[in-house]
């Protein structure tokens, strides 16, 4: 156990956390797309991240499926999430052993818009992971936060990486 979890704090997620979470989400039939720092990393750009960011379809049924999957985390922090929270708030932060941010919309793009706008499925350790395409990630970075500056400056790198 690392120092953060010894103090009851969340630790930075690692790739195996992402794989485990996506395995659980898939088992529950949850509709989600990986966005944010891990998505950027999977496209080949170096980026640190403190959370796993998921764009989720915001229906009550799907949020319940997401919560069941998040219930595999040790502190069961997802039990505190109401079914309508993803529709009511910009970001729903589930701070368990790791932090998972749930978004119903990202820069005006909801789950259906993401599916239409470009999602690819990557297999990680045998687990299919729906991942925002490079183009979709750039569209989602239309708003600039301080921690996004390296990604925003590197947005042209996505264009150069296109197949």
Protein language model features and the residues they cover:
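Compositionally biased terminal segments of proteins
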Residues: 1-163
């Amino acid at each position: 156990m690392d120092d953060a979890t010894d103090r009851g704090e969340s630790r930075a997620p690692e790739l195996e956390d992402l794989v485990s979470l996506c395995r659980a989400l898939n088992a529950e039939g949850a509709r989600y797309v990986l966005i944010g720092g891990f998505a950027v990393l999977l496209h080949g750009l170096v980026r640190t991240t403190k959370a796993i960011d998921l764009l989720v379809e915001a229906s009550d049924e799907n949020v319940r499926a997401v919560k069941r999957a998040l219930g595999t985390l040790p502190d069961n922090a997802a039990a505190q999430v109401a079914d309508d929270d993803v529709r009511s708030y910009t970001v729903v932060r589930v701070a368990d052993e790791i932090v998972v941010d749930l978004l119903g919309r990202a820069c005006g793009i909801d789950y259906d818009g993401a599916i239409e706008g470009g999602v690819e499925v990557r297999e990680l350790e045998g687990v299919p992971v729906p991942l925002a395409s490079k183009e979709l990630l750039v569209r989602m970075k239309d708003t600039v936060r301080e921690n996004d500056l390296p990604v925003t400056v590197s947005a042209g790198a996505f264009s150069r990486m296109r197949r």
